[in-house]
């Protein structure tokens, strides 16, 4: 994906990591430096255009990634640059991966509710002309190392069939734990939670009231709370 400004100078590294501040990375020594506000506007343009491209590829009604969404959430965006593409010396973008921690209520394999806060895959896009060249795995692997997580510890928001196949091919993630929300988790998710998942007390059947102990009566709270 190409832009009218110098992507190669704006993003010096092959993979750039952006947070909610969308600050331009440090420039290489010897390069001219436009006003910082102009650089941030260029960053925002890249984020917006990548979000639109991802939404189009996934047939979504609207982008789920944009500069404004990034600024209002504590998400992290990994952007992969094509170091070999230099149209007019400006470089190009291969794709991106967006992640973030979210508090979720998920079911384990015994259908017990668990309150967890895993790292979630929120959006993932590689330009159509550059797929099946190892770029997706390179980007995903960089994120795993940077965030210090294992693939089975992730929760994925509304994954496409293409993403599920990608995870199966590269990370042997196949068996999912059925959920009632839009997130997908895989077998092994609960075995490696850190911090540990907090289990919620099972819902009591109507009329099944547990007797109070003396200490419970003194505290005014039913046993188990």
Curated annotation (Swiss-Prot):
Post-translational modification N6-acetyllysine, affected residues = 56, 146, 210
Q: How is it modified after translation?
A: Autoacetylation strongly increases tubulin acetylation.
Task: List every stretch annotated Disordered.
Answer: 195-225
This protein's record includes keyword Protease: no
Example GO biological process: regulation of microtubule cytoskeleton organization
Q: Does the keyword Membrane apply?
A: yes
Q: Which UniProt keywords apply?
A: Acetylation, Acyltransferase, Cell junction, Cell projection, Coated pit, Cytoplasm, Cytoskeleton, Membrane, Transferase
EC no.? 2.3.1.108
Q: How does it assemble?
A: Component of the BBSome complex. Interacts with AP2 alpha-adaptins, including AP2A2, but not with AP1 gamma-adaptin (AP1G1/AP1G2); this interaction is required for efficient alpha-tubulin acetylation, hence clathrin-coated pits are sites of microtubule acetylation.
Q: What's this protein's family per the entry?
A: Belongs to the acetyltransferase ATAT1 family.
Looking up HAMAP family in the UniProt record yields: mec17
Q: What is this protein called?
A: Alpha-tubulin N-acetyltransferase 1
Species name: Bos taurus (Bovine)
Q: What is the lineage of its organism?
A: Eukaryota, Metazoa, Chordata, Craniata, Vertebrata
Name of the coding gene? ATAT1
